[in-house]
C-alpha cells in the first residue's frame, strides 16, 4: 500500500474532479494527468481509500448510536449528540462526501479505462466496491439517488431501498463474473493498484461471496429471507483467517493529508474518526460484554478485554528529577450511558498530568455525598465544613475541575493513540502521552483503533457468526454451536496474529502484546462460552459477534435487525441484554416511540446530508414522507421493515 499510494499521491486531486468532466481524446499530456490518462492502477487505490474513509467514519458514528462508544462532553457537538440520540444533520455529511466525491465518482471512469484494455479484474473490483458503497448508503440513509446517480444529471431522482439492494446484489454478481475471467494480454495486473488484497483474485471472490452472505442475512425481517441462500454464499466466502479481507495501515512520518477531511492518508480510517483526538470513550455496556457482567452473565473476564479497553497510568512514583520510576495500570471501566446521568452533569471530562502539586477545593453540601467522596479519595485531603481540599502530588493524574462529581473521571480512559501526525514519539510508540518528556501515559489505545491497526473489511469470524445465526434460525443447534465456537476461536487467532506483529515491530505497549494462550484456553472452557449446543441463544451469538467485529457499522445493522432489546423477533427473546436508550435521551420529536416494541422507539437511520438538501432538495422531499422532518431518524430503512 505504501508504494502504491506514494506513486499515485500527486494525482488524486485532479482525478477526483476531472472524472466529472468531458475531456477531448486528443493531446493527452502524460505529465499532466486527466480523466483519460488516469489508468486503472492509479484510480483503484484512491477509490479504495475514500470508500474506507467513509466506512471508518460510519464505524465510529454508528458505534456511538449503538452504545459501544460515547463522547466526553454533554450533547453539543454533532457526534456527541449521536450518543444522546439527539442527532443533527451535520453528522450525515462526511460519510456521504467521501463515498461520492472521493470514491464513487471514479468508478465509471475506472470501468471505462479497464474495459479498453481488457483489465477484467479492475472491472470486478469496481463493481464490488460499488456494491459496498451503495449498500452503506442504503444502510445509513435509506432512499438514495442510485440509478440516476453519477450520470451527470444535476437533480437525480431517488430510488427506494429495494431497488438499491437488488442493484448491489447484481453488482456483486457482475464482480464475480469479471473476477472469474482471464485478463487480456497486456492488461494491467490487479496487483499494481490493489491496496486490499494485493491483486489476489481468489480473495476478491471470497469478499464478493462474503458480502453476498452478509447482505442476504440483512433482510432477515423480510418474507423473502432465504437462510439456504445465505449458507450457499458462505460456502465460497472466507473459510479461515487466511481469507480475511484486510487493509493494512501505516504510522509514518510526513504522511500526506486527505483533502476532504485533512487526516493522514495511510492511517487506519476508524482511528481517524474514533481515536485521533481525546473525546472518545467506550461505554459500560460494551465493557460489560467483556467482563460478562450482565443479566445472566458468568462474570468471567475475557482475555481480549485489555486489548480492547485502554488503560492509563496510576499510582505513579517519581524520582527526585521528576521522572516516572514506578506505576500501575488502571483499566477503563466504560461510561454508563444507559443508567447514569454523567453527561447531564458535564462529564466525563479529560484528565491531566500534574507537573507540579495541584490543590482543589470541592464544595459538597450533601453529607452522604461528601462522606462517599472522602472514602474514594486516594490523595491527601483535609475537610473544612462542607469543603474537601484535595492535594494532588506531582505525577498524579487529575481532572481540572472543582466539581467533585468530575474528580473520578480518570476512570474513563480516552481512546486516543498518537500517530506521527499527532505528536507521536515514534512509528512503534503510539501511546497517548499527557507529558511525553516523562512518558506519562494517558491512554494505551484500542486494538481496532490505532494508527496502524488493520481495517477488517470482511472476516472469517463474521462469516462464522452469520452461519451460527442462520443455523439457529433453522433450529439446527449443533451446527449453530460449532459455528459459534469457530467464530470465537477465529477472533482470538486473528487478534493474536496482529498482536504478534506489533510485538515483532518493537512496541513497548503491553496492550499490544499477545494474549497468554493459557488464558485463552481457560476462557474458551469457562462459563463465558456456551459449552452445550442445547443452551446456545441468539444473545450468546451476537455478544461474541460484537466483540469480534469491534468498532464496525455491522454491529448497528444487526442491532436494528433484532429491534435492539425489544425481544420481539421470532422466539429469540432479548438479544441485546440490559440494553436501554441513553439515560439522557429527551429528543422525542426525533425518536417519538413510547414502547420498545414500536419501531420508532429506536434510532433507525441518518437524515440526508446538506449536499442533498442544498442541491437536490426537490427530489429528496419526494423520496420519503418524513424526508427532512425530525422523525426521519427513527424511520426504518427498507430492509429494517417487515
Predicted regions and their residues:
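Structured, solvent-exposed acidic/aromatic patches
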Residues: 38, 72-466, 470-499, 534-536
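Short, compositionally biased low-complexity segments
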Residues: 20-24, 75-81, 138-145, 504-519
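Long, intrinsically disordered, low-complexity segments
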Residues: 200-201, 214, 274-280, 287-300, ...
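Sec-dependent signal peptide recognition
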Residues: 3-10
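Bacterial Sec-type N-terminal signal peptides, specifically the leucine/valine-rich hydrophobic h-region
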Residues: 14-17
Amino acid at each position: 500500500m505504501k508504494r502504491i499510494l506514494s506513486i499515485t499521491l500527486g494525482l488524486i486531486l485532479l482525478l477526483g474532479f476531472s472524472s466529472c468532466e468531458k475531456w477531448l481524446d486528443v493531446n493527452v499530456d502524460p505529465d499532466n494527468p486527466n480523466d483519460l490518462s488516469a489508468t486503472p492502477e492509479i484510480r483503484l487505490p484512491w477509490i479504495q481509500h475514500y470508500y474506507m474513509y467513509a466506512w471508518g467514519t460510519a464505524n465510529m458514528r454508528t458505534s456511538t448510536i449503538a452504545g459501544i462508544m460515547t463522547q466526553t462532553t454533554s450533547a453539543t457537538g454533532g457526534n456527541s449528540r449521536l450518543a444522546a440520540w439527539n442527532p443533527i444533520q451535520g453528522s450525515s455529511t462526511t460519510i456521504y462526501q467521501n463515498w461520492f466525491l472521493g470514491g464513487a465518482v471514479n468508478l465509471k471512469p475506472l470501468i471505462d479505462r479497464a474495459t479498453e484494455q481488457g483489465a477484467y479484474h479492475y472491472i470486478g473490483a469496481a463493481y464490488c466496491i460499488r456494491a459496498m458503497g451503495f449498500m452503506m448508503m442504503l444502510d445509513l440513509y435509506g432512499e438514495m439517488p442510485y440509478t440516476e446517480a453519477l450520470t451527470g444529471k444535476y437533480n437525480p431522482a431517488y430510488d427506494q431501498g429495494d431497488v438499491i439492494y437488488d442493484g448491489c446484489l447484481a453488482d456483486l454478481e457482475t464482480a464475480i463474473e469479471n473476477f472469474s475471467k482471464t485478463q487480456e494480454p497486456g492488461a494491467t495486473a490487479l496487483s499494481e493498484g490493489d491496496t486490499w488484497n494485493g491483486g489476489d483474485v481468489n480473495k476478491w471472490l471470497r469478499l464478493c461471496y462474503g458480502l453476498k452472505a452478509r447482505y442476504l442475512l440483512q433482510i432477515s425481517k423480510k418474507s423473502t429471507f432465504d437462510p439456504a441462500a445465505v449458507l450457499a454464499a458462505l460456502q465460497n466466502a472466507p473459510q479461515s483467517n487466511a481469507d480475511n479481507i484486510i487493509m493494512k495501515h501505516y504510522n509514518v512520518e510526513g504522511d500526506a493529508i486527505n483533502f476532504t477531511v485533512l487526516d493522514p492518508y495511510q492511517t487506519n480510517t476508524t482511528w481517524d474518526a474514533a481515536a485521533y483526538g481525546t473525546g472518545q470513550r467506550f461505554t459500560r455496556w460494551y465493557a460489560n460484554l467483556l467482563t460478562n457482567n450482565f443479566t445472566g452473565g458468568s462474570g468471567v473476564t475475557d482475555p481480549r478485554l485489555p486489548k480492547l479497553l485502554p488503560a492509563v497510568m496510576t499510582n505513579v512514583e517519581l524520582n527526585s528529577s521528576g521522572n516516572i520510576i514506578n506505576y500501575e495500570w488502571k483499566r477503563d471501566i466504560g461510561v454508563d450511558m444507559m443508567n447514569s446521568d454523567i453527561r447531564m452533569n458535564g462529564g466525563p471530562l479529560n484528565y491531566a498530568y500534574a507537573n507540579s502539586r495541584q490543590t482543589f477545593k470541592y464544595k459538597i453540601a450533601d453529607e452522604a455525598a461528601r462522606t462517599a467522596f472522602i472514602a474514594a479519595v486516594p490523595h491527601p485531603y483535609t475537610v473544612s465544613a462542607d469543603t474537601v481540599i484535595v492535594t494532588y502530588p506531582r505525577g498524579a493524574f487529575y481532572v481540572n475541575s472543582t466539581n467533585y462529581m468530575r474528580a473520578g473521571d480518570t476512570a474513563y480512559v480516552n481512546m486516543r493513540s498518537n500517530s506521527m501526525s499527532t505528536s507521536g514519539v515514534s512509528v512503534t510508540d503510539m501511546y497517548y502521552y499527557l507529558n511525553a518528556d516523562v512518558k506519562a501515559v494517558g491512554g494505551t489505545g484500542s486494538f481496532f483503533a490505532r494508527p496502524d491497526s488493520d481495517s477488517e473489511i470482511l472476516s472469517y469470524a463474521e462469516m462464522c457468526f452469520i452461519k451460527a445465526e442462520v443455523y439457529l434460525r433453522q433450529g439446527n443447534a449443533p451446527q449453530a454451536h460449532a459455528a459459534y465456537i469457530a467464530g470465537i476461536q477465529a477472533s482470538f487467532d486473528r487478534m493474536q496474529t496482529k498482536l504478534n506483529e506489533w510485538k515483532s515491530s518493537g512496541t513497548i505497549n503491553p496492550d499490544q502484546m499477545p494474549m497468554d494462550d493459557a488464558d485463552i484456553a481457560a476462557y474458551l472452557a469457562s462459563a463465558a462460552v456456551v459449552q452445550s449446543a442445547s443452551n446456545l441463544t441468539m444473545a450468546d451469538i451476537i455478544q461474541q459477534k460484537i466483540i469480534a467485529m469491534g468498532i464496525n457499522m455491522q454491529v448497528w445493522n444487526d442491532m436494528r435487525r433484532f429491534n435492539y432489546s425489544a425481544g420481539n423477533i421470532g422466539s429469540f427473546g432479548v438479544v441485546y441484554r440490559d440494553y436501554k436508550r441513553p439515560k439522557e435521551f429527551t429528543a422525542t420529536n426525533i425518536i417519538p416511540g413510547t414502547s420498545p416494541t414500536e419501531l420508532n422507539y429506536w434510532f433507525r437511520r441518518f437524515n440526508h446530508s446538506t449536499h442533498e438538501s442544498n442541491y437536490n432538495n426537490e427530489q429528496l422531499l419526494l423520496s420519503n414522507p418524513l424526508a427532512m422532518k425530525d422523525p426521519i431518524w427513527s424511520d426504518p430503512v427498507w430492509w429494517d421493515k417487515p
